[in-house]
Amino acid sequence: MAKKVLAMVKLQVQAGKANPSPPIGPALGQHGVNIMEFCKAFNARTADQEGMVIPVVLTVYQDRSFSFITKTPPASVLILKAAKLAKGSSDPKKIKVGKITKAQVEDIANLKMVDLNAKDMAGASKIIAGTARSMGIEVV
């Protein structure tokens, strides 16, 4: 018989830097999860992606055990990294803060393809380009 699911917890955590302090501690503590066990497992799984923000979906079972799935970094983080920027524009329609090439957009779309709601690379590239435009970054 399958374990009964108690909760699904979604977090965005720096790769390799999970620790029991907020926001991780309170989010997992209220469900009775062993926080240090999660932190060690997460840090081991994401050690090769140092410096990236990694979304994680944690499934907590009724016996207080857990499993988790790591996803690809958010498109906005990948776009900022490609454009070598710290943050996007405060007014994206008027103020453009950087540029990325179509090749960079395609690379990001290829990386994000598993998490995007797109049937092909062209659709995925359009999604990534739209995200870049909404951040005040031009696609050239």
From Swiss-Prot:
One or more lysine residues are methylated. GO terms for cellular component: cytosolic large ribosomal subunit. Gene3D superfamilies: Ribosomal protein L11, C-terminal domain, Ribosomal protein L11/L12, N-terminal domain. One of its GO terms (biological process) is translation. Pfam families: Ribosomal_L11 (PF00298), Ribosomal_L11_N (PF03946). CDD domains: Ribosomal_L11. Forms part of the ribosomal stalk which helps the ribosome interact with GTP-bound translation factors. HAMAP family: Ribosomal_uL11. One of its GO terms (molecular function) is large ribosomal subunit rRNA binding. Transmembrane segments: none annotated. Coiled coil: none annotated. The keyword Cell division does not apply. Keywords: Methylation, Ribonucleoprotein, Ribosomal protein, RNA-binding, rRNA-binding. Belongs to the universal ribosomal protein uL11 family. Part of the ribosomal stalk of the 50S ribosomal subunit. Interacts with L10 and the large rRNA to form the base of the stalk. L10 forms an elongated spine to which L12 dimers bind in a sequential fashion forming a multimeric L10(L12)X complex. Disulfide bonds: none annotated. The keyword Endoplasmic reticulum does not apply. NCBIfam families: L11_bact. InterPro entries: Ribosomal_uL11, Ribosomal_uL11_bac-typ, Ribosomal_uL11_C, Ribosomal_uL11_C_sf, Ribosomal_uL11_N, Ribosomal_uL11_N_sf. This is Large ribosomal subunit protein uL11.
